[in-house]
């Protein structure tokens, strides 16, 4: 698909700020600093549409990006080790759960996992939650350029087994802004 237009539609701190849309949405989820924003930029062939940072926890709102006026990509706050108070992390968790459970137009979730570390307990918990709520999911293994080809292939198999996936996760590299073919 050729991306003709892409822009920030809304940044929501609460469910009352979610845009009232009927178009399909794809959400991007994962721990803090795993590469959610980088993956979205890569898929859209944009370098700076979605703000990225080397500091975990920079995405603090649910950001809705309108693509070609026909669908939205949704950047969720990361979970895990962001250096913010526990109350704020809990409010993010509730906001994410509200979004994932209430959006009728949510067509799927891209779960992003750092290939070097594999799934965390929170990744497994989110995967179980998505399975239970019958939300379609695609797993992407980020930071694949940090490993050799052989180690990358081995890690993909481990992630597949650990998460009980039907197919291998898709490896992604931020260096060449693309999905890697193994």
Name the predicted role of every residue range.
Residues 3-12, 147-180:
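Canonical P-loop GTPase G-domain recognition
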Residues 39, 181-182:
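Adenylate-forming
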Residues 58, 71, 78-81, 116-118, ...:
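Conserved nucleotide-binding/hydrolysis micro-motifs of P-loop NTPases
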Residues 89-93, 120:
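Amphipathic alpha-helical transducer elements in NTP-driven molecular machines
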């Amino acid at each position: 698909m050729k991306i003709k237009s892409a822009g920030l539609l809304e940044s929501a701190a609460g469910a009352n700020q979610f845009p009232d849309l009927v178009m399909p949405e794809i959400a991007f989820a994962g721990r803090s600093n795993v590469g959610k924003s980088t993956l979205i930029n890569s898929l859209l062939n944009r370098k700076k549409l979605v703000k990225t940072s080397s500091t975990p926890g920079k995405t603090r709102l649910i950001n809705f990006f309108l693509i070609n006026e026909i669908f939205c990509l949704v950047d969720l706050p990361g979970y895990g080790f962001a250096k913010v108070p526990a109350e704020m992390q809990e409010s993010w968790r509730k906001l994410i759960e509200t979004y994932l459970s209430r959006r009728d137009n949510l067509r799927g979730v891209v779960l992003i996992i750092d290939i070097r570390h594999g799934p965390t307990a929170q990744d497994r918990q989110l995967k179980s939650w998505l399975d239970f709520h019958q939300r379609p999911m695609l797993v992407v293994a980020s930071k694949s350029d940090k490993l050799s080809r052989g180690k990358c292939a081995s890690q993909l198999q481990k992630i597949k087994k650990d998460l009980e996936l039907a197919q291998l996760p898709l490896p992604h590299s931020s260096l060449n802004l693309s999905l890697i073919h193994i």
